[in-house]
């Protein structure tokens, strides 16, 4: 029973950290990266379709993304979707290729993004700690039902704490890397 509880906590903590990394990757840095456009949905024949299903997105240089739309008739809809997204990007169509120059981030915008990333990291830490609390509660329930001894309970709680520390450290490292990325000019 203890092993299952600890494994469940570990799996949930891993998912929390992965979710945080995914959220952080969506925060725009000064560099062009195709994942910036992951959240863009295009109205394609009346259906909202993810942009990455309609176009090949590549990085042309550190400040420019290039899109090659598979269906040329959808180019206008793709451009409109990018303009209407909250990313603040202005695509420029050049025949079959749509180029998206990324404006450099201002110092003020960088600081705002760092605040956002720090808040996301704190939410990630809170999620990991909540998982720890749930797992420790499950262990205490096993102790109350006399399915485990007090020593087993203490050992399980120590192991859960080690897992918590490990995943909080991963969150802190991801935050540090993202902050450095954001503040880099």
From Swiss-Prot:
SUPFAM superfamilies with a match to the protein in the record: Ribosome recycling factor, RRF (SSF55194)
Keywords per UniProt: Cytoplasm, Protein biosynthesis
GO biological process: cytoplasmic translational termination
Residue ranges the record marks as coiled coil: none
Any matching Pfam family: RRF
Keyword Cytoplasm applies: yes
Predominant location category: cytoplasm
Record-stated family: Belongs to the RRF family.
Name this protein carries in UniProt: Ribosome-recycling factor
Species for this entry: Idiomarina loihiensis (strain ATCC BAA-735 / DSM 15497 / L2-TR)
């Amino acid at each position: 029973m203890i092993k299952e509880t600890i494994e469940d906590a570990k799996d949930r903590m891993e998912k929390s950290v992965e979710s945080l990394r995914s959220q952080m990757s969506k925060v725009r840095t000064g560099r062009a990266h195709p994942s910036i456009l992951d959240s863009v949905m295009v109205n394609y024949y009346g259906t909202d379709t993810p942009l990455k299903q309609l176009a090949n997105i590549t990085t042309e240089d550190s400040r420019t993304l290039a899109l090659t739309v598979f269906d040329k008739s959808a180019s206008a809809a793709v451009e409109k979707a990018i303009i209407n997204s909250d990313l603040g990007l202005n695509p420029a169509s050049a025949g079959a290729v749509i180029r998206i120059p990324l404006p450099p981030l201002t110092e003020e915008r960088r600081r705002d993004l760092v605040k956002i990333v720090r808040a996301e990291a704190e939410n990630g830490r809170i999620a990991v700690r909540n998982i720890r609390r749930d797992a420790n509660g499950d262990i205490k329930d096993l102790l109350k039902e006399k399915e485990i001894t007090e020593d087993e309970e203490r050992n399980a709680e120590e192991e859960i704490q080690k897992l918590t520390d490990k995943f909080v450290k991963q969150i802190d490292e991801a935050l540090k890397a993202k902050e450095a990325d954001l503040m880099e000019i």
